[in-house]
Amino acid sequence: MGNGNSALLGTDLDKFEKIRLKRGGKKCYRLKHLCWCKGELDRFGLSDKLLETQQGCEKILSVCWPLYDQGSDNLKALVGTVCVVACIHAGIEIKSTQDALKKLKVITRKEEKQEDESKNFPVQRDAAGQYQYTPISPRIIQTWVKTVEEKKWKPEVIPLFSALTEGAISHDLNIMLNAVGDHQGAMQVLKDVINEQAAEWDLTHPQQQPAQPGGGLRTPSGSDIAGTTSTVEEQLAWMNMQQNAINVGTIYKSWIILGMNRLVKSHCPISITDVRQGPKEAFKDYVDRFYNVMRAEQASGEVKMWMQQHLLIENANPECKQILRSLGKGATLEEMLEACQGVGGPQHKARLMAEMMRTVVGQSQNFVQQRGPQRGPVRQPTGRKPICFNCNKEGHVARFFKAPRRKGCWNCGAMDHQKAQCPKPAQQQRVNFFRVWPLGSLQTGELSGTRGDSNSSTIRGETSAENSEHLSEIRERAQAEDEGGEERGGFSFPEYSLSRRPIEEVSVDGVTIRALLDTGADDTIFNERNIKLKGNWQPKIIGGIGGNLRVKQYDNVYVEIRGKGTFGTVLIGPTPIDIIGRNIMEKLGGKLILAQLSDKIPITKVKLKPGVDGPRIKQWPLSKEKIVGLQKICDRLEEEGKISRVDPGNNYNTPIFAIKKKDKNEWRKLIDFRELNKLTQDFHELQLGIPHPAGIKKCKRITVLDIGDAYFSIPLDPDYRPYTAFTVPSVNNQAPGKRYMYNVLPQGWKGSPCIFQGTVASLLEVFRKNHPTVQLYQYMDDLFVGSDYTAEEHEKAIVELRALLMTWNLETPEKKYQKEPPFHWMGYELHPDKWKIEKVQLPELAEQPTVNEIQKLVGKLNWAAQLYPGIKTKQLCKLIRGGLNITEKVTMTEEARLEYEQNKEILAEEQEGSYYDPNKELYVRFQKTTGGDISFQWKQGNKVLRAGKYGKQKTAHSNDLMKLAGATQKVGRESIVIWGFVPKMQIPTTREIWEDWWHEYWQCTWIPEVEFISTPMLEREWYSLSPEPLEGVETYYVDGAANRDSKMGKAGYITDRGFQRVEEYLNTTNQQTELHAVKLALEDSGSYVNIVTDSQYVVGILASRPTETDHPIVKEIIELMKGKEKIYLSWLPAHKGIGGNEQIDKLVSSGIRKVLFLQNIEPAQEEHEKYHSNEAQLREKFHLPALVAKQIVQSCSKCCHHGEPIKGQTDASLGVWQIDCTHLENQIIIVAVHVASGFMKAEVITAETGKKTAEFLLKLAAQWPISKLHTDNGPNFTSQEVETMCWWLGIEHTFGIPYNPQSQGVVENKNKYLKELIEKIREDCKELKTAVAMATFIHNFKQRGGLGGMTAGERIVNMINTELEYQYQQNQISKNLNFKVYFREGRDQLWKGPGILLWKGEGAVVLKYQEEIKIVPRRKCKIIKDYGESGKNSQVNLESV
């Protein structure tokens, strides 16, 4: 058996043909399998002679075996066949391919194991048994560098790096990384990952064995593994130890690969779950994207295999998903690609058809004409000349034939020219379909393009003003011509509504069939049960629903629609629906005119948040009437194309419900998108507020438009639509619920406002460029258009705007098109010369209205306050203070009822606002209302543009000037938003009162330019506090005391002239008695008075000069203070020796409370008077509380500071430094300050350059730890030298703003202090650099204070020491993890455990048991070590933890 060319001869071939292909199968190997095997070997560049010997077969397997697991089915079949041949050569008895694979696999693994044992490059053992190191070759380094330069950091870089560094040590790996050091960002990422892994290694291997005196190796640390603190010899020794060898090279390599995975992920931020196939994307392109992203995923091989088997199918588009699921779970990637090759857009299908045609033309096959006249001789397999498909002549093919084609022009169909010479413009070369005017009785022509009249042009989305009218004119003209009986050379279908499927009766060879007109189908196909055609046919396979379909192809079949027919190709097969494809409709002259142009609107891509999936919330029960109402709404929306049915595979759902419309019997559909909104990406609000009429420039012509069906006009991202799925249930579960999803922006979805605003704004930008002088305001779907055009020009601009919107199918309904005043817009009523607020009707309030009714009322009043002055809501808001339910009823007070009636009277008188005139000055005038609020109006001349009020009260006690300052800030912010600048402000007070208050309260942030208008009311309500004691005036020492238990209290005063008064009070507190004491002093004193108190509470209230309060006692004190000419208020601690304060303290304390006596306050005051010591010195030396020491300092007129600025937050971490340059004596001093401790380093530099700054930074980093550097954005700090030094040192560099205290406040303050120190010692120094060094020494080691009362030098050392102790303590705590805890709970006598010890205290322990944290008493637990020691020793060791 066999022939000379066979690899097996005689008996070997007989044995071969008895071996089964599969175990338990019937088919056996044949000679054809050997022939096929030889052909496959040629693909691998292997000779077929290798099959003739056993050694040759083993060589084949050495090449193919490593690819077996990941190889295709052909490769696995080839390996199996070679294994069978090898077993026959070796005389091994086998019965099937699986037996051969099993036996050959064992042999190959043994050989591989032997090879692995002998392969130890780059470490080689010499004859003496010593390990010799072979450095990595330059060729490998060159390959690595070239790969990084070409591939950057794509996923394929990682396996190449792993292959190039096989067996390398840490030294080699560092050489590889240094070779690509130009990639600084990537190297920094790798460095961070290596440092993290090294720290984790040190944490998990805390017991470091030092080097032994006898030459023993130390245990490698994390830095040793990274090769930074170890030598090549040590690395080799660790890798080749006899016992407990540590392969540092492999460990370090895994760290680097971990960092590379992070790099790859940063360069490929798309998650594998986000890779989804587009609706018209080719499956091959989708697979390429999928695998590129999957390579970047940090996952194991099993996980990636699961991704390939599940995610690849689940994320495909519905068409491919249905085909792939029909293939089953075991389908290979090749089978998937073959099955889905027909899925894609028109370009993909055209490319696929071209490739198929090229394949067919290139092959020598018989083409038999099975129906109709033959176009030429039958092509023979070989030895015949080619036939031209154009002229049917032999000797050439169609593409080399120069004569015109038989079918004429591809554009218009005329026979007298080609497409290149077609006179019609390129815009009309598109194939159009449904016409938009009705069709009369016309004669059928050969081609539709032969009609030459002007009406044959395609209706496109024009931007001209006549667009909307142009369509109706064409319709009317076409109808008139049709009625006139004018003949046309072309043929067109009538108009078909897309609210339902376009199905038409079709005659096919005399058989009538109802078929779907499908412009997306390439071919015409009918179900074999509906029609039987006669004649010859050809077999064909096409891609259909559920997979490939085997159909019969009939040529030259006559198809007739509405009396108009043509000949074409028809397919007959098992299709679920009969379809008329483009091949027939094109011959009939079908045109597709897109009356709905929403496909021109750009799609905004939307995604879910990373790591989440869509909502799956069940639909709750609905009543029958709601279900019926919802179904009607959904049917209408589906007809309009705004929603569509959902595939059965969609498992997302969002619940819906229905409510009745106001005063109607119709239902309104609502959908609960709360869960989907949580899962969806965040959107930025494009418009932060509504436009205001006061900011509109006065114009002659106004028009207000509204975009109809605003959200429903903008398409939703097709990839996101499945997440909006919802279900309309049926009553009693009579049938499965109908499932829909949104095709447009849904109401209630978080992204709808942002996407709608952005989409419409991009379209309106065209109009704004064409009409720069026109004011076009857009807020959601409301449009305001104002201009100074003439009436005709303005109307023309409006027509152009509406036509522009229509190009994107954004309609502006006539019923909301406002041409004449008054114009209703955004709640306002607009006129050409004025604007109003739409009439505000206040509802009648009952005696006990609900919280919700009060809230609505306050909202209406606040809306009206922008134009109606004097509106107050303070008393109404008091009714709903606290956490009340919106349905809870409240009782109207007399004040609230009065406020309500006053507001009603104000609203009864209509108010008008004016538009902004850029040529006139804009100013704001403030007034104080009787209710205490601040009202204001924006004015130009005598005209009011708008009004407002300010009643915000942050504290219980406030004054008018503080409230006035807050009002000016509010007005300034609103003015910038509306007009873009801050106008001049007229405040109702005098300059003296304002500056007197402002002197004490300068830190209230920003105040604009003001103009003072004296108002007697505000002057009368103001009172002055003197900063110094009044000479010759009686001094009142006041005090109060109360008993916490009995609530009894006393308050009184004693004067320096011997007068005294003490009153008793019931049910009072200590703070109230202090206030009563001040009140008594004000009642009995004259117009000028000195008051001394020991109450910080009283001073804190009265020092801010409040004029309004809800506190009854404070209110009385304010009224008494207004009647005084001058008041001096001071604070002194209530202790012995301080004036008459001690005496009044004894009077009011008698029988009330026990007075504490502190002897150190008086000496502290004396010391401060002598040396002006700071607070820290007083607290340290005299052991005073911080509050007392601070008050002693602030009571000194020389040390007192008027107010303190509002401070921000400064990063005071341990490693944070601030650096700045200052100038003194025409020289440059660079100053560095440690933010946390205040430690300073300074020196004189020759030039303020990046090089000198970098040198200073390096010297600083060599002495002190730095993790973060903060500077201003000066050129020396932003230079390349400083950035490089920060990168090398691993320092984070941040920038601030020069001279901004919030940016470099610490170093700016030190600059000033350093200069003061230098000034004191400058006379003792010859050179400035010596003075700088001495001043730095004094600051760091001779100035005590701040945190801990230490010097700056002591403080920074203490902080570093504390940080090290903390880290040591954390390490000690981690040792607790070595202990296990067994414990009992409650009355349960059974021991539970073991748990993990987290903390051990004196009476209890904290442990973790089964993911739960427990606190157990020490008497109910036993703690043992986790490793082998006796119970006794374990207990002893435990107590030492």
Curated annotation (Swiss-Prot):
Q: Which segments does the record annotate as Integrase-type zinc fingers? A: 1159-1200
As annotated in the record, motif Nuclear export signal runs over 16-22
Q: Where is the lipid attached (N-myristoyl glycine)?
A: 2
Tell me which residues are marked as the site Essential for RT p66/p51 heterodimerization: 997
Motif, Nuclear localization signal: chain positions? 26-32
Cofactor remark from the record: Binds 2 magnesium ions for reverse transcriptase polymerase activity. Binds 2 magnesium ions for ribonuclease H (RNase H) activity. Substrate-binding is a precondition for magnesium binding.
Q: Which residues form the RNase H type-1 domain?
A: 1030-1153
**Signal sequence: where?**
none
Q: Which top-rank group of organisms is this from?
A: Viruses
The Peptidase A2 domain, residue ranges: 513-584
Instruction: Provide the binding site for Mg(2+) 2.
Output: 1039, 1074, 1094, 1145
- Per UniProt, Zn(2+) binds at 1168, 1172, 1196, 1199
Place the motif Tryptophan repeat motif on the sequence.
994-1010
UniProt-listed Gene3D superfamilies: 1.10.10.200, 1.10.1200.30, 3.30.70.270, Acid Proteases, HIV Type 1 Reverse Transcriptase, subunit A, domain 1, Human Immunodeficiency Virus Type 1 Capsid Protein, Immunodeficiency lentiviruses, gag gene matrix protein p17, Integrase, C-terminal domain superfamily, retroviral
Modifications after synthesis and translation:
Specific enzymatic cleavages by the viral protease yield mature proteins. The protease is released by autocatalytic cleavage. The polyprotein is cleaved during and after budding, this process is termed maturation. Proteolytic cleavage of p66 RT removes the RNase H domain to yield the p51 RT subunit. Capsid protein p24 is phosphorylated.
Instruction: Return the annotated region ranges for RT 'primer grip'.
Output: 823-831
Please state the Enzyme Commission number of this protein: 3.4.23.16, 2.7.7.49, 2.7.7.7, 3.1.26.13
Which residues are responsible for catalysis? Answer: 518
Q: Where is the Reverse transcriptase domain?
A: 640-830
Provide the binding site for Mg(2+) 3.
1220, 1272
Q: Which residues form the CCHC-type zinc fingers?
A: 386-403, 407-424
Chain ranges of the Integrase catalytic domain: 1210-1360
Query: How does the entry describe the domains?
Result: The p66 RT is structured in five subdomains: finger, palm, thumb, connection and RNase H. Within the palm subdomain, the 'primer grip' region is thought to be involved in the positioning of the primer terminus for accommodating the incoming nucleotide. The RNase H domain stabilizes the association of RT with primer-template.
Q: What else is known?
A: This is an African mandrill isolate.
* Protein function: Gag-Pol polyprotein and Gag polyprotein may regulate their own translation, by the binding genomic RNA in the 5'-UTR. At low concentration, Gag-Pol and Gag would promote translation, whereas at high concentration, the polyproteins encapsidate genomic RNA and then shut off translation. Matrix protein p17 has two main functions: in infected cell, it targets Gag and Gag-pol polyproteins to the plasma membrane via a multipartite membrane-binding signal, that includes its myristointegration complex. The myristoylation signal and the NLS exert conflicting influences its subcellular localization. The key regulation of these motifs might be phosphorylation of a portion of MA molecules on the C-terminal tyrosine at the time of virus maturation, by virion-associated cellular tyrosine kinase. Implicated in the release from host cell mediated by Vpu.
List the protein's name.
Gag-Pol polyprotein
Gene for this chain: gag-pol
